[in-house]
Amino acid sequence: MKLGIHAGPQDLSMEELKRLWSIGDSKGFHWVSVWDHFYANPLSSRDNPCFEGVSAMSGLAAMTKNVRVGCLVFCALFRNPGLLAKAGVTIDHLSGGRADIGIGAGWFEEEFREFGYGFPPLGERFAQLEEALELISALWKAQPIENKGRFYDLRGAVCSPQPLGLKLWIGGRGKDKTPRLAAKFADGFNMPYVSPELAGDRLQRVQRACDEIGRDFSEIDSSVNLGFYMNSDRKPDIAAEGSLTGGTQEAIDMIGKFRDVGIKGINIA
C-alpha cells in the first residue's frame, strides 16, 4: 500500500505548503498532490488564500526530488486541453518524470460562475471532459492533432517535448461515466472521501468497463483520499465520510479494508 499526502493549496501560506511538501518528500511518502480550485472548499471566506493549481504543482515539482507529484484533479473546463497537455509535460520535465495529472469535470458551482465559466449541466461537463481527455492523450503521443469537435478546435497542434514519465489519472466517485472514462483513458483512478465498500464497487465498475473494451484492468493504478481525524475530539457523525478516525489500530484496520477491495494507495487529505 502506497501512502501519499493530498494537500489542497488553500488556507495556508506558500511557506507552510512548502514545509508540508518537504516533509512528504523527505519522510518516505510515495505521493504529494495539490488540487485545482479558485476558492477554498468549504467556502468559509473568499479572503482565505487559495493558490492556482498549475502554478502550485509546478512549485511542488521543482522543490521535491523523490515523491511523485500530482493534481487531483485539474478541472477540464478551466483550461483548453492543449494548454493543459503542455502544462503537464512542462511539470513532468521539471520533476524529472515524476508527474501525474488528474482530470475531472468540476463540481463547485460558485467558483465556475464567479470566475466567468458558467456552469453547464453535468452531462455537458462530462462530454467536455471526454473530448479533452481524447485530445490530451493524443497530444502526448507527438502526432499533429486536427480536431473540430463540439467544444475544441485544434488545427495541427503538436506537443513537444514528449512526456518523460507523465501519467493520467481520472478522479471522481460517479458510478457510470467516471469508471468508463477511467477504463478508456486513465493510468490511475482516484476516489475522494469514500468508504471501502464504495471504493470496491467503483473499482469493479472500472474492471467491467475494461473488459468491455478489451483493456487489461491491472494496468490501472488506484487510490483514495481520506480525511484525517485520528485521536481527534471531532464527533464521528460530523467527520467526513472516508476518513481515518480513532487511534492507530483503527486507522490500520481501515487501511486494510481498502487494501482488501483492491485499492493500491491512500492519500491523507
Give short role names for the model-derived ranges.
Residues 1-269:
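Active-site-adjacent structural elements that line small-molecule/cofactor binding pockets in enzymes
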